[in-house]
Regions:
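N-proximal low-complexity "stem/linker" segments adjacent to membrane-targeting elements
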Residues: 1-23
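Conserved donor nucleotide-binding strand/loop of the catalytic core
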Residues: 42-65
Length: 154
């Protein structure tokens, strides 16, 4: 059964990091890569059991710090829907062999409601797909998971 690490790049996200971490129940590890926050982002993340690494000046594949090969990349402004959470629990029950990546839909908050955006690559095997600046390279061949990521913009 595959294990899953959530990778979240942060900077001064103390007010919203809790929401995304609470939605990541299918993940076995939370890895926060912090970019010099001056607020309580690191303290809040650690309260949720997250491991914290620092972004630093050099380019680096921060996925190397993860304990697992499968990485779910999310933003602090996002959260999993219940449908995506259920899909990830189901996903963890299956071995994925040569799979490289999986895609998810995005629903973005606007002043007029929620907009559906095209699916993006967010769940990747770090040994097969590169992750730069906290997000994976787009892989249109990845299978689409049920559910969406909610992106909170307001």
């Amino acid at each position: 059964m595959p294990k899953l690490t959530a990778l979240i790049r942060t900077r001064n996200d103390a007010a919203r990091i809790g929401r995304v971490l609470e939605s990541l129940r299918p993940c076995d590890e939370f890895l926060i890569i912090d970019d010099d926050s001056s607020d309580d982002t690191i303290r809040v993340a650690r309260e949720y059991g997250a491991r914290v690494g620092l972004a630093g000046a050099e380019d680096r594949n921060h996925a190397e710090l993860a304990q697992n090969d499968w990485i779910l990349c999310v933003s602090p402004a996002e959260a999993l829907t219940e449908a995506l959470e259920a899909a990830l629990f189901e996903w963890k029950q299956i071995e994925h062999g040569a799979a490289r990546s999986f895609r998810v839909g995005i629903r973005e908050e606007t002043r007029k409601g929620w907009n559906s955006l095209p699916p993006v690559t967010r769940l990747v095997n770090r040994r097969r797909v590169g992750i730069g600046d906290g997000m994976p390279a787009e892989d249109p061949s990845g299978h689409l998971l049920d559910g969406d990521l909610l992106r909170f913009c307001l």
